[in-house]
């Protein structure tokens, strides 16, 4: 590393991709065990190992970028391309759920009663909690933009305030979504409506939790003066991800809650 004559970051061997993959295997297996046998041990183990992996991997990246200076402009450019490609892959991930929803709802089969929502399903009122959730996420999009502008201007106090507001709104959205799930009259096993509704909104909720975690890490890093006005790609990536989550929710709201009801 000391004799390299290029600007690229040659990453040292790391165990975290392997432990991350194993924790993902434990989590998916644990989810199946929870659904079928009501056992949460494997899921808890998977989530614990995943959190430990995330913490240690983030710690290594922060050390390499902030303290060792490995994230040169050319490395940051590569990270930007990587984040853009990741978000594009997420777009296609959600496109699958929208495809399933529209495939089922635009031409409902006789088994569904020939109508949408299917016979016996009482959909949620789109003008109640879903509309509140929409306003919460739109407000969080405004506050994350405020945080970004404050960081670019070197206004640390406003950046921390805006980031804290965004995280609070993200947590509030998650709590509202959980309360909505608790109150629904249908479940994930109630035919194609239940499965498409809970898969699409559930995976979006998971992305909100991931995005909130991402922002919490950025908040802690900002407290420790890790970001400057010209070196803050960690925060920028979190902001891009949060805007993506916002846009997906708008499509979910219009498609599943409003049109689909």
Swiss-Prot record:
Source taxonomy: Eukaryota, Metazoa, Chordata, Craniata, Vertebrata
Transmembrane segments: 16-34, 41-66, 73-105, 129-152, 156-183, 191-223, 233-256
Catalytic activity, EC: 7.1.1.9
A biological process term (GO) from this entry: mitochondrial electron transport, cytochrome c to oxygen
Any one Pfam family match given in the protein's UniProt record, by short name: COX3
Gene source species: Felis catus
Protein name: Cytochrome c oxidase subunit 3
Catalytic reaction annotation: 4 Fe(II)-[cytochrome c] + O2 + 8 H(+)(in) = 4 Fe(III)-[cytochrome c] + 2 H2O + 4 H(+)(out)
Ranges in the topological domain labelled Mitochondrial matrix: 1-15, 67-72, 153-155, 224-232
Keywords, sorted A to Z: Membrane, Mitochondrion, Mitochondrion inner membrane, Translocase, Transmembrane, Transmembrane helix
InterPro entries xrefs: Cyt_c/ubiquinol_Oxase_su3, Cyt_c_oxase_su3_dom, Cyt_c_oxidase-like_su3, Cyt_c_oxidase_su3-like_sf, Cyt_c_oxidase_su3_a-hlx
Subcellular location: Mitochondrion inner membrane
């Amino acid at each position: 590393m000391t004799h390299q004559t290029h600007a690229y970051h040659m990453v040292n061997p790391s165990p975290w991709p392997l432990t991350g993959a194993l924790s993902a295997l434990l989590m998916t297996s644990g989810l199946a065990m929870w659904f079928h046998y009501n056992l949460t041990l494997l899921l808890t183990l998977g989530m614990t190992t995943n959190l430990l992996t995330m913490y240690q991997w983030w710690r290594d990246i922060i050390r390499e970028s902030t303290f060792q200076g490995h994230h040169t402009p050319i490395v940051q450019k590569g990270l930007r391309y990587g984040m853009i490609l990741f978000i594009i892959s997420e777009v296609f991930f959600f496109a699958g759920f929208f495809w399933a929803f529209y495939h089922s709802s635009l031409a409902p089969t006789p088994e569904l009663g020939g109508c949408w929502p299917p016979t016996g399903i009482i959909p949620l009122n789109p003008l109640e909690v879903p509309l509140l959730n929409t306003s919460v996420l739109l407000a969080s999009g405004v506050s994350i933009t405020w945080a970004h502008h404050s960081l670019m201007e070197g206004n640390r106090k406003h950046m921390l305030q805006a980031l804290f507001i965004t995280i609070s709104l993200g947590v509030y959205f998650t709590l509202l979504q959980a309360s909505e799930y608790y109150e629904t009259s249908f479940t994930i096993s109630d035919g194609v409506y239940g499965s498409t509704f809970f898969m699409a909104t559930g995976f979006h909720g998971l992305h909100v939790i991931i995005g909130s975690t991402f922002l919490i890490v950025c908040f802690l890093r900002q407290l420790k003066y890790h970001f400057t006005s010209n070196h803050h790609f960690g925060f920028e990536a979190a902001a891009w991800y949060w805007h993506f989550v916002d846009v997906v929710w708008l499509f979910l709201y219009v498609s599943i809650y409003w049109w689909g009801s």
